[in-house]
Amino acid sequence: MAKEFSRTRRIGQQLQQELAVVLQRDMKDPRIGFVTVNDVDVSRDLSYAKVFVTFFEEDKDVVQEKLNALIAAAPYIRTLVAGRMKLRVMPEIRFVYDSSLVEGMRMSNLVSQVINSDKAKQQQFGSVDDDVIENDIEESDDTEGKV
């Protein structure tokens, strides 16, 4: 039976916190810029850590350049984090761009556009009266009882 808070999950959470601090304070590479560590998935044997990151930029080319800079700096980042954590073996860090935040924002914008479009159509053509809706409901109830 799996524990609620497994060791790999606790190490992943600590690694996420330490990576955020290292990337914010210790990394001076201007190519990386502002980066957010969303999640860290550590393998069961603690040999690999998949780090999900997002950037302030939305342009795909700029995001890819920043991700490549992080991948190139991964060994250096690993040594900085290893000095801050008490582990016998520090996991190999693999950076992965997390597009879920961008996709969530895109979906939210689409929903907002549809809502605004519906409101505009409602104002343009007028709203349906509540009496008409109630009459339709009553008529459908009457026909269901007669069947």
Curated annotation (Swiss-Prot):
Positions of region (Disordered): 122-147
Q: Where's it found, cell-wise? A: Cytoplasm
Q: Name one Pfam family in it.
A: RBFA
Compositionally biased spans, kind Acidic residues: 128-147
**What InterPro entries is this protein classified in?**
KH_dom-like_a/b, RbfA, RbfA_dom_sf, Ribosome-bd_factorA_CS
Keywords of the record:
Cytoplasm, Ribosome biogenesis
Q: What is any one of the record's Gene Ontology cellular component terms?
A: cytosol
GO BP terms: maturation of SSU-rRNA; ribosome biogenesis
SUPFAM superfamilies reported in the protein's UniProt record = Ribosome-binding factor A, RbfA
- Which GO terms label this protein's molecular function in UniProt? ribosomal small subunit binding
Q: How does it assemble?
A: Monomer. Binds 30S ribosomal subunits, but not 50S ribosomal subunits or 70S ribosomes.
Q: Which family does it belong to?
A: Belongs to the RbfA family.
The protein's matches in HAMAP family, at most eight in alphabetical order, are given as: RbfA
Function of this protein?
A: One of several proteins that assist in the late maturation steps of the functional core of the 30S ribosomal subunit. Associates with free 30S ribosomal subunits (but not with 30S subunits that are part of 70S ribosomes or polysomes). Required for efficient processing of 16S rRNA. May interact with the 5'-terminal helix region of 16S rRNA.
Q: What is this protein called?
A: Ribosome-binding factor A
